[in-house]
């Protein structure tokens, strides 16, 4: 895990992939199966490894919580 601040260009790229790619793909999916969740988390893990900064992982975790709330009908 990289403990240095994330460079602006990498932060911008990470946010684009997290929000406009990964989150957009999963945010409105209803009735996710265990296989869906496995794929969702696996994709997020890959992004976490790609960027390897605590901030990216924390934002990813927050987005997973949002997807969980939406699954519970909280949107």
Can you annotate each of these PLM segments?
Residues 34-42, 57, 61:
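Short, charged, amphipathic alpha-helical segments
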Residues 49-75:
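Short, charged early-sequence alpha-helical segments and their helix-coil boundaries
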